[in-house]
């Protein structure tokens, strides 16, 4: 998603000094045509030129969003390695310069999730579109739809869990949108 800044169609892998691996890749390319087309290569190069700027904005927003969510009474839990409350915070500090642009958080239940998602205006509901927009996904009906409830809950994927991949929109706009959507959740809880 972050390489392209568009809806490009490839992945980048780099592995050196492994002739067996190189032979396998060469065979795959020969048989399946695994080489990106000219336009896909151009999109990748274009995306890499602005990746630093896009990541700075996404990370800055993700940090502020995670802090806001952690303080909000309608949110049960926030999973973001850039928060001091995260169990992996110290390791993350040693390994990375930020907590990244993806976080998850938990609301009370599926009803709260639906009220929240319905009220949102900015994030797109999807698994991934490969663009620069913020994307909200609901693992229960998306990535983990085929996983039995008992197994999914063992993995921490509850009926109230949402995943937010933060895009490059204005931080204040994202915070305002998320806050107003959480207010709708609180209204629903009070009823």
What label would you give each PLM region?
Residues 50, 65, 82-86, 107-109, ...:
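Glycine-rich beta-alpha junction loops
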Residues 24-28, 77-82, 162:
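Beta-strand segments within the central parallel beta-sheet cores of soluble alpha/beta enzyme folds
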């Amino acid at each position: 998603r972050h390489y392209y800044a568009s809806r490009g169609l490839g992945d980048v892998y780099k592995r050196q000094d492994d002739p067996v691996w190189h032979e396998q890749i060469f065979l795959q390319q020969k048989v399946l045509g695994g080489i990106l087309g000219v336009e896909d290569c151009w999109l990748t190069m274009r995306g890499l030129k602005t990746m630093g700027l896009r990541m700075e904005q996404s990370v800055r927003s993700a940090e502020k969003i995670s802090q806001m969510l952690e303080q909000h009474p309608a949110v049960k839990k926030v999973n973001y390695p850039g928060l001091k409350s995260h169990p992996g915070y110290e390791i993350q500090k040693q390994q990375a310069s930020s907590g990244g642009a993806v976080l998850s958080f938990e609301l009370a239940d599926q009803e709260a999730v639906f009220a929240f998602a319905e009220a949102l205006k900015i994030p797109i509901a999807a698994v991934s579109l490969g663009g620069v927009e913020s994307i909200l996904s609901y693992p229960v009906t998306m990535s983990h739809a085929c996983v039995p409830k008992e197994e999914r809950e063992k993995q921490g994927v509850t009926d109230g869990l949402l995943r937010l991949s933060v895009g490059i929109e204005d931080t204040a706009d994202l915070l305002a949108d998320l806050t107003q959507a959480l207010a709708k959740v609180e209204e629903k809880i009070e009823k």
